[in-house]
Regions:
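Gly/Ala-rich beta-loop-alpha elbow adjacent to hydrolase catalytic centers
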Residues: 68, 81-89, 93, 101
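A structure-centric signal for secondary-structure junctions around beta-strands
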Residues: 1-2, 123
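Alpha/beta catalytic cores of group-transfer enzymes, especially the acyltransferase/condensing modules
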Residues: 10-11, 38, 96-150
Length: 150
């Protein structure tokens, strides 16, 4: 059987996103690396931080990639036949494919988020739209001087 793994991008964070993997030994080095980057235990951060803090680009991206890497490590798979990532999920995909270690993927993810924030300034933002047809969406984009970039 051929295995494929798709690593999601920065999406909705859930406070229980590590519940299935947090007690497994495979997650410990990944969570430790995330702790070093976030300056806080990821599990404690998810439990106590306010929503704005969790949605900060760097925090959200590091948590998202940590979750993916922990999940893959918990499965104990030796690299799927095919691995792909969407947006920041590419960072996890490259690690899972063997390009770099999970800790390096997290460091690069943090740096990626910092560079994105520096390039963006205060005028930008990212949005998610569901449930509108193309015409409705285009009218909203035009009315608010927005564009689809992904």
């Amino acid at each position: 059987m051929t295995r494929a793994l798709l690593c999601s991008g920065q999406g909705r964070l859930a406070r229980n996103m590590f519940d299935m993997v947090k007690s497994g030994p495979a997650a410990l080095p990944i969570l430790a690396a995330a702790n070093d980057l976030l300056g806080a235990d990821p599990l404690a951060l998810l439990a106590s931080a306010d929503t704005d803090t969790l949605l900060e680009n760097r925090t959200s991206q590091v948590l998202s990639i940590s979750r993916t890497l922990c999940s893959h490590a918990a499965l104990g798979l030796r690299g799927p036949a095919l691995v792909a990532g969407y947006s920041v999920g590419e960072m996890a995909a490259w690690s899972i494919a063997g390009l770099w270690a999970p800790e390096q993927a997290l460091r690069l993810t943090a740096r990626r988020a910092e560079l994105m924030d520096a390039a963006d300034g205060d005028a930008g933002g990212l949005g998610f739209v569901r449930g509108l047809d193309a015409g409705q969406l285009m009218r909203l984009l035009d009315a608010h001087d927005c564009a689809i970039a992904i």
